[in-house]
From Swiss-Prot:
Lineage of the organism: Bacteria, Bacillati, Bacillota, Clostridia, Lachnospirales
Substrates-to-products reaction catalysed: pseudouridine(1915) in 23S rRNA + S-adenosyl-L-methionine = N(3)-methylpseudouridine(1915) in 23S rRNA + S-adenosyl-L-homocysteine + H(+)
Top-level taxon in the UniProt lineage: Bacteria
UniProt-listed HAMAP family: 23SrRNA_methyltr_H (MF_00658)
EC number: 2.1.1.177
Keywords: Cytoplasm, Methyltransferase, rRNA processing, S-adenosyl-L-methionine, Transferase
Keyword Transmembrane carried by entry: no
Protein name: Ribosomal RNA large subunit methyltransferase H
Xref: SUPFAM superfamilies: alpha/beta knot
Amino acid sequence: MKITVVCVGKIKEKYLTMAIEEYSKRLSRYCKLEIIELADEKTPDNASPAEELQIKKKEGERILKNIKDNAYVIALAIEGKMLSSEELADKMQLLGVNGESHLAFVIGGSLGLDSEVLDRADFKLSFSKMTFPHQVMRTILLEQVYRGFRIMSGEPYHK
């Protein structure tokens, strides 16, 4: 299975980069992982709602250009469906059984995802009703995908 993570924003913190590298290495046993890091738009502190929409639209266009037509798209969104680790593993396994060989997870920038990206998504996944920094979310996502593959393989994982 191929897993693509399309994300807006650069990781600047070394500890997050190290965690992402570690989970990328661990995932290499289970899938072909590609992380596509896209530039984020600068958001003024006092941005109007119209400016925020324009920023999300620009970031959304970049995201959509980097999603392959054959990918099953999972957008990370607060309004999405919350799953347990086991349920995420089941979903990934069922998608694989049903012939989906390419999953693309999408993480938006600080303002979230544009409506066109959400419309393109085959599934909207929420990790929490809380908001997380998008840089931290990348690490959390990779850990959960790794945990999902461990569960699917019947290997032990920390509960």
